[in-house]
Amino acid sequence: MTAKKRSASSTRWMQEHFDDHYVKLAQKRGLRSRAAFKLEELQEKDHLIKPGMTVVDLGAAPGGWSQVAVKLVGDRGKVIACDILPMDPIVGVDFLQGDFREDAVLNALLERVGDEKVDVVLSDMAPNMSGSDGVDQPRAMYLVELALDMCHQVLAPNGSFAVKVFQGEGFDEYMKAVREAFKVVKTRKPDSSRARSREVYLVATGYKL
């Protein structure tokens, strides 16, 4: 991508961002990102999170999904969040800053979880996009594979998993792996996802040990 193209692309993104209905609505409701509406839509359709549950939120910053999750689990529940980027504190959310790809960070996250299994694993992780599918897609697939591996380590029987996946090379194989691990897997494209984005969300329920 040339500097001129990149500049035009960035300008278009900024214009879309500021004109975006969901961005304005998020600001009005005090939500940290428009992504919060994606989780709200998934919750409305699939009822993933219930009061008293323990939820792990991967790729949490700036905190839109954690804000939604902590309200849903209530005082008796727990939300454990992780991101490579910093995140301002949210009451009721135990946040760990670090690169989830590193063993030390994974181990620290597992320590936060403790011996209790979790009910829901959420992943809105995405790599820094370079604009090259040949680079971006493998990076994105690596992250979602790590998220599925996290499910295998911490998820309770019949637990649930919601993960952002970019359609492209490796998607079908990943879908197969998720289907092998869960009883029911649905593909969702929330209304709040940008139409031109290749992102979809896999909502998997009924974790099979």
Swiss-Prot record:
GO-annotated molecular function: rRNA (uridine-2'-O-)-methyltransferase activity
Catalysed transformations (reactions): uridine(2552) in 23S rRNA + S-adenosyl-L-methionine = 2'-O-methyluridine(2552) in 23S rRNA + S-adenosyl-L-homocysteine + H(+)
InterPro entries linked to this entry: RNA_methyltr_RlmE, RNA_MeTrfase_FtsJ_dom, rRNA-MeTfrase_E, SAM-dependent_MTases_sf
Subcellular locations according to the entry: Cytoplasm
UniProt xrefs under SUPFAM superfamilies: S-adenosyl-L-methionine-dependent methyltransferases (SSF53335)
Binding of S-adenosyl-L-methionine, residues: 63, 65, 83, 99, 124
Main location: cytoplasm
EC number: 2.1.1.166
tRNA processing is among the record's keywords: no
Annotated Gene Ontology cellular component terms: cytoplasm
Keywords: Cytoplasm, Methyltransferase, rRNA processing, S-adenosyl-L-methionine, Transferase
Active site, renumbered: 164 (proton acceptor)
Family stated for the protein in its record: Belongs to the class I-like SAM-binding methyltransferase superfamily. RNA methyltransferase RlmE family.
HAMAP family: RNA_methyltr_E
Function field: Specifically methylates the uridine in position 2552 of 23S rRNA at the 2'-O position of the ribose in the fully assembled 50S ribosomal subunit.
Name of the protein in its database record: Ribosomal RNA large subunit methyltransferase E
Species for this entry: Shewanella amazonensis (strain ATCC BAA-1098 / SB2B)
Upper taxonomic lineage: Bacteria, Pseudomonadati, Pseudomonadota, Gammaproteobacteria, Alteromonadales
